[in-house]
Amino acid sequence: MSVLLIAEHNNKELKSFTLNAVTAASQIDTDLHALVIGNNCGDAAKAASELPLVKKVITVEAAHYENFLAENFSPVVTKLADNYSHIVCSANTFGKNLMPRVAAKLDTSQVSDIIKVESTDTFVRPIYAGNAFATVKSTDAKKCITIRPTSFEPCESSGGSAPIETAEAGEEFLLTKFVKREEVKSDRPELGTARIVVSGGRGMQSGDNFKLITSIADKLNAAIGASRAAVDAGYISNDHQVGQTGKVVVPDLYIAVGISGAIQHLAGMKESKVIVAINKDGEAPIFSVADYGLEADLFEALPQFLEELNKLNTIQK
């Protein structure tokens, strides 16, 4: 049977992680269908149809799908589920909210946060904050799976021409009401998809000292991250948190400043292509995953680093 991928979008365009999820889903079965639920989401459906790995797009539109509530989405998914052996979406906030509800309604066990597809019924997922990996075999006839997007390359975004079909919308779930959405507006790259991330930890000592991180991030056109310790201390807002309970990032360059390297933080960044650590404690666990380490006082090292960047007189693009 086919694989149903629940596409994430903003009613106008696909979210970037959907491309990673498509790659993963196509490794389960090449007969891959994308489900686009929303309101006036024709552009997103068209974008999904242009993905070469997608064989068919199913779109469901109604005003009560505007804000992507799992309570409204899940009946649509379960109604279509009979035609599919696997139901897949990203293991981000969207997927973690939706998929448990879908799995419960289908009376099946969810396989969460997979990083590798071994076969149609066997998958690899991290456990113990990424310090070990479990190979999981699902014997359920219908499998509900969430995928860690950063573990898979994004698929090609053009060249396909999948047909678009329309399915009937369900009734609105009235016990849950959308109140509002507050989005953080920034000129910086989005943390989850940035090529360069500069993160600060408890060693920054205060929120004001994060201005050092900001100055360097400005020169590198980088996203700003933080450890949970820095967030809990109130140095920076939690939308910057990297780690097991924050965002998982896989940038080309990750600069960790004043971060000791608790396993929860390492779980969110240790797959970065190049890791640079700056910490005055030479025994800090962060050095165990770093490609380059500088044992130094960050309040001396960062101004020197910024001075050298200023000499280049350029901002990375």
Q: Where in the sequence are the language-model features?
A:
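N-terminal glycine-rich FAD/FM-binding segment characteristic of electron-transfer flavoproteins
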Residues: M1-K317
